[in-house]
From Swiss-Prot:
GO molecular function, one term: purine nucleotide binding
Compositional bias ranges of the Basic and acidic residues kind: 51-63
Full protein name: Protein FAM114A2
Residues that bear Phosphoserine: S87, S146, S209
Disordered, as annotated region: 1-65, 342-366
Family in the record: Belongs to the FAM114 family.
Keywords annotated in UniProt: Coiled coil, Phosphoprotein
Upper classification of the organism: Eukaryota, Metazoa, Chordata, Craniata, Vertebrata
């Protein structure tokens, strides 16, 4: 050990000038290096634990002497530099921890203010909700008590708070949107009285009688809460149509039509082969007669008198060979035309007599009353004429089904009923024109906004009446189909009965 110390001491003194020349530093640095080397020489006993070097040649001995010296120099220099960098790193870490603590405290204050203003739960409440995650985080913080770990703990708490806050905001926003949507639909349903009714009508198929009955019931409920019930009843088509038993006859006709349709389907399902094909051809011919041809109202410019209409309807019913007669229908039509003639002559006579101003004012009052009366009687006449027409169709269907003898074929009856339907529709159109002419004549001095709605209502109800009659005519198709099938079966029986005497002979 003494030899080794003697060798290392002069070499260390030589290393100092080398560092001064190589690093171009002042002599103070060399002194600091020497001072730093002195403690290292005191710690040399650690090197004595090394193995004794083996005997080597002189050249190897010189290299072996140089290498330990270089190792000692390289050890001394990094150790002195690490001490400098270590102290600098500690100062950086301490300043960083202080900065992080300050920033974390500021962020915590901001979060607390935001929580109090927005009503967001505090971190303590959030930590209880995510207890498992917070437990793991606290365990890691206990293991690593460095300032950096504390900063990460603050950031993890902030991220957890932000996540939970985001979830609560999103869920609350979705709940708000759902509430707004439901409230909007409720407002729409309340604002639109026909909203629920429209949805109900789309889910079911209503017949004509059901629609008319619902309209009548709705109007009765509406008019029951008003003072002028009688006035509204005079001008409401549905109530008047039911008053003349039109709705009852229409429902009965629908029942007969449905029963006949079921029978026709069962008969067709029981047949096959040539009989089925022959019957289908005949039924198709019958359906063609129920397609009403478009008629032009301007073709008949000359107005028919009361006798002409009664004569035409009576002749058509005689061709059906049924016991019913259109007396009630003809009487309703004649009553309407007679009232129109009287209402047209009344204003003319009043205008001739009214010469003074007082008389003119009385004439205006009479004209106002006559306009309302004309409109009310027009609606009443249209409803009565339509109800009588549907009553005739109902009676005809019942007589065709229950009649024993069939003197005419089903196709001939369908052609007659088609002509009758066209005559009735033309009569309704002509009657509405006469009523509007009467309204125009009586309301010459009236404003357009008073007279036009009345005229429009008359034309509208006349169009509806024609549609009801055409629908009732279509309900007769299954009835006549049953009549055709029964007539064919009966003729087939007569043929078989005629062939039996020939076979006996």
């Amino acid at each position: 050990m003494s030899d080794k110390d003697d060798i290392e001491t002069p070499l260390l003194t030589e290393a100092a000038p080398i560092l001064e020349d190589g690093n171009c530093e002042p002599a103070k640095n060399s002194e600091s290096v020497d001072q730093g080397a002195k403690p290292e020489s005191k710690s040399e006993p650690v090197v004595s634990t090394r193995k004794r070097p083996e005997t080597k040649p002189s050249s190897d001995l010189e290299t072996s002497k140089v290498l330990p010296i270089q190792d000692n120099v390289s050890k001394d220099v990094p150790q002195t530099r690490w001490g400098y960098w270590g102290s600098w790193g500690k100062s950086i870490l301490s300043s960083a921890s202080a900065t992080v603590a300050t920033v974390g405290q500021g962020i915590s204050n901001v979060i607390e203010k935001a929580e109090t203003s927005l009503g967001i739960p505090g971190p303590s409440e959030i930590s209880t909700e995510v207890k498992y995650v917070a437990g793991e985080t606290n365990a890691k913080e206990n293991e690593n008590s460095s300032p950096v770990a504390g900063a990460f703990g603050v950031f993890s708490t902030i991220s957890t708070a932000v996540q939970s806050t985001g979830k609560s905001v999103i869920s609350g926003g979705l709940d708000a949107l759902e509430f707004i949507g439901k409230k909007t639909m409720d407002v729409i349903a309340e604002g639109d009285p026909g909203f629920k009714r429209t949805k109900g009508l789309m889910n079911r198929n209503a017949t004509l009688s059901q629609v008319l009955r619902e309209a009548k019931e709705k109007e009765e409920i509406r008019t029951s809460n008003e003072v002028t019930v009688e006035t509204d009843k005079k001008t409401h088509y549905g109530l008047l149509f039911d008053e003349f038993q039109g709705l009852s006859h229409l429902e009965a006709l629908e029942m007969l039509s449905q029963e006949s349709e079921i029978k026709v389907k069962s008969i067709l399902n029981s047949l096959s082969g040539e009989e089925l094909e022959t019957l289908k051809v005949e039924l198709e011919q019958l359906k063609e007669t129920f397609s009403l041809a478009e008629f032009c109202e301007e073709e008949e410019e000359e107005k028919k008198g009361d006798e002409d209409f009664t004569k035409d309807i009576t002749e058509l019913f005689s061709q059906l060979h049924v016991s019913s007669k259109p007396e009630k229908l003809a009487r309703a039509r004649n009553t309407a035309h007679e009232w129109i003639r009287k209402s047209l002559t009344k204003p003319l006579a009043e205008n001739e007599e009214g010469e003074k101003q007082s008389e003119a004012e009385n004439t205006e009052q009479v004209n106002k009353n006559s306009i309302e009366d004309i409109h009310a009687f027009a609606i009443r006449s249209l409803a009565e004429l339509t109800a009588c027409s549907i009553e005739l169709f109902h009676k005809t269907a019942a007589l065709v089904l229950h009649g024993r003898k069939q003197e005419v074929t089903a196709i001939e009856r369908s052609q007659t009923l088609s002509q009758m339907t066209i005559v009735l529709c033309k009569e309704l159109s002509s009657l509405s024109k006469e009523f509007t002419t009467c309204l125009t004549t009586a309301g010459v001095k009236e404003m357009a906004d008073v007279l036009n709605p009345l005229i429009t209502a008359v034309f509208l109800e006349a169009s509806n009446s024609a549609s009801y009659i055409q629908d009732a005519f279509q309900l007769l198709l299954p009835v006549l189909e049953i009549s055709l099938i029964e007539n064919k079966i009966e003729s087939h029986r007569h043929e078989l009965q005629g062939q039996k005497p020939l076979l006996e002979h």
